[in-house]
């Protein structure tokens, strides 16, 4: 188990990662899950599921992100156990990163899909989860922008209940949050893909760098 801590907008954040695998060049993190897994791009985009990517943004250091995964750690017995070790999540689809992540793959059979994650060396079956290296870097960095915005809103006193549609039914805090489903309209989650999320992060990063440059120039 790997501990991580970082500062976001002046706020100290810390947590623990179940597992971290790495080489001198690449790093991936894995979280073991016994319950349901929601690893959709939409959940990440809206900020409901940014924990793993936020950990990666800090733990990677100078290394290149190779993947952020949830590992289904169910103890139930099933008749068909095919794919029981298949991790769910998002990853760097560069040839070198894929080979580092699964040593059973070979350049001699580049279209063979890994048993452990949704990728092959060529023609990966799920391109929404497998990204080019730079795109995946930006995708991971998006979590920092969401955390930064959340911290800023809390500092400004914004604590209103603004749930997404369909989430109140399973919320343990429904009796105390004050959200009135009769008079208030829950937010809707719009479909988005990983490339669009990465592009948003890239533009936000460029804007932030421009702001820092202007501030330094004015000193």
Which sequence ranges carry the predicted segments?
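Structural signature of nuclease core domains in nucleic-acid processing machines
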Residues: 1-219
């Amino acid at each position: 188990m790997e501990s991580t801590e970082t500062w976001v907008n002046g706020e100290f954040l810390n947590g623990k990662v179940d597992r971290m695998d790495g080489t001198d060049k690449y790093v991936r993190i894995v979280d073991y899950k016994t319950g349901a897994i929601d690893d959709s791009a939409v959940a990440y985009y809206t900020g409901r599921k940014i924990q793993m990517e936020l950990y990666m943004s800090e733990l990677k250091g100078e290394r290149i992100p190779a993947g952020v995964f949830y590992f289904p750690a169910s103890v139930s017995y099933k008749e068909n156990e095919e794919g029981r070790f298949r991790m769910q999540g998002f990853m760097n689809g560069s040839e070198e990163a894929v080979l580092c992540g699964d040593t059973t793959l070979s350049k001699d059979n580049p279209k063979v899909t890994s048993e452990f994650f949704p990728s092959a060396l060529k023609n990966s079956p799920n391109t929404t989860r497998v990204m080019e290296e730079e795109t995946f870097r930006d995708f991971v960095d998006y979590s920092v922008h969401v955390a930064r915005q959340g911290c800023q809103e809390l500092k400004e006193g914004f604590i209103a209940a603004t749930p997404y549609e369909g989430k109140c039914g399973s919320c343990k805090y429904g009796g105390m949050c004050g959200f009135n489903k009769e008079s208030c309209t829950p937010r809707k989650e719009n479909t988005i893909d990983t490339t669009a999320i990465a592009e948003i992060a890239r533009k936000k990063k460029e804007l932030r760098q421009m702001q820092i440059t202007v501030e330094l120039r004015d000193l």
